């Protein structure tokens, strides 16, 4: 289950709003993620993503961010200050399978960087910022959502 699916389900269970940060970025910039990346490059996109995520002001919401949000220290500190950061941990093989259309998905890759390189670069950052880590290689939906709804 991906971040958006998990986020929508959790939001419904908790009676919260669901916010897709990628959609917020697209709305604020008036462009698709891949268009932003094409225009300003990966570093420029990360700056935009950091700015937008640092300014999110929501209550009783589940926020699904893009994977590159972990490069923005200000965004991650802001997200941690307004809620609990959950890392949906996936083995590389599963991530590779899910991201078959990597360019169309707006994945931030530097020139010459492979998906494996990106994975190995980001995992320590996800682990650093996570308050909770959920291993997504096993489906826990039936176990975790009822427990979470009591929080």
Q: Where do the protein language model's features map onto the residues?
A:
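ATP-dependent small-molecule kinase phosphotransfer cores
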Residues: 23-69, 73-77
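A glycine- and Lys/Arg-enriched "phosphate-lid" helix/loop adjacent to the NTP-binding pocket
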Residues: 82-123
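ATP-binding Walker
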Residues: 1
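Conserved small/polar residues in nucleotide/adenosyl-binding loops
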Residues: 141-147
